Amino acid sequence: MAPLRFSANVSWLFPELPSLPARLRAAGSSGFEAAEVGWPYGEPPEALARTAQEVGLQLVLINTPPGDREKGEMGLGAVPGRQAAFRDGLEQAWVSSGHLLEVRSIPVKDAGAKGKRGLVCSAEFTRLEMIHLMAGRVPQGADRAAVRDEMETVFLENLRHAAGVLAQENLVGLLEPINTRITDPRYFLDTPQQAAAILEKVGRPNLQLQMDIFHWQIMDGNLTGNIREFLPLVGHVQVAQVPGRGEPGSPGELNFPYLFQLLEDEGYKGFVGCEYQPRGEGGLSSRPGPGEGALEGQVSGRGCFPPRGLRCLGFLSPQETR
């Protein structure tokens, strides 16, 4: 059974650092092997790919653009009347992913080429794999039940289009249910059951489920049953403690050592994204001592740093976030 692999969500972690490249460097120096970025569109994608490459990080996930944040938009995939804007945003994400895919090698001196520059392939550090296709919110003032069918129809149409676009670069599109009890009361896609039903209707193999354990616990609980039921559809996992959306080491409802073991036992092979609000900056607050080899890793003020496929230390417990 392979140990879990962790990715740093640099839109959440290292908040004391002002730029995404700086956060990527911090993630690399903290022992992460991968990173994900919510909305990378304020930075040149080549710069992000180059930084990730320099510190040995694989970039695994970005989101489609949120739309007009000033008007309260948080994704456009299921929003009636915004189909063209969703497709424009998908194109923007796809173009960004193309840049991240292109920066696959670094120049090095080729000793046998009389000073000419050669290339060493490092695609494993830069290849973007997944794009979260954000569903968006129920329109302001609309009744959720009244617009549900229309929004699902729009979402299905957009997802079929997205699947075709993403297939051109062998990318996977992800659907993430976001809880409507605490985080986003108007978000359209809010349970794994709803997302799984939509995936079945779309019927595209490169569309999968994004399991954020924080949201799933808030909406439905029953994490053991839901993980076992839906894991075959899952392409990516994210974690945070409930209800405070802190790191797995903070007080809360979730028993993360158990959940991480469950994911391993069920054969999950993807990354576990650390998407939480860190308690502090810098410095390790705890390290495994002698005889704790089965729980290899580090725990810091920011939570779990897994340089060797960390399963969080036995005393940890989790919290929530989007």
Question: Where are each of the predicted segments found?
Answer:
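Aromatic- and glycine-enriched glycan-recognition loops and surfaces
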Residues: 21, 40-42, 88
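Conserved beta-strand positions in the central sheet of alpha/beta enzyme cores
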Residues: 36, 60-63, 132, 174, ...
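Active-site-adjacent beta->alpha loops and helix N-cap segments on the catalytic face
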Residues: 41-54, 254
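Active-site acidic/histidine proton-transfer and metal-coordination neighborhood
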Residues: 53-54, 58, 74-208, 218, ...
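Active-site-proximal loop/turn and secondary-structure-junction residues that shape catalytic pockets
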Residues: 12-14, 39-41, 65-68, 135-139, ...
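Histidine-acidic metal/acid-base catalytic patches
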Residues: 2-31, 53-56, 92, 113, ...
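A short beta-strand-loop structural module common to alpha/beta enzyme folds
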Residues: 32-42
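Short, conserved active-site loops that position catalytic residues or coordinate cofactors/metal ions
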Residues: 26, 30, 61-72, 134-136
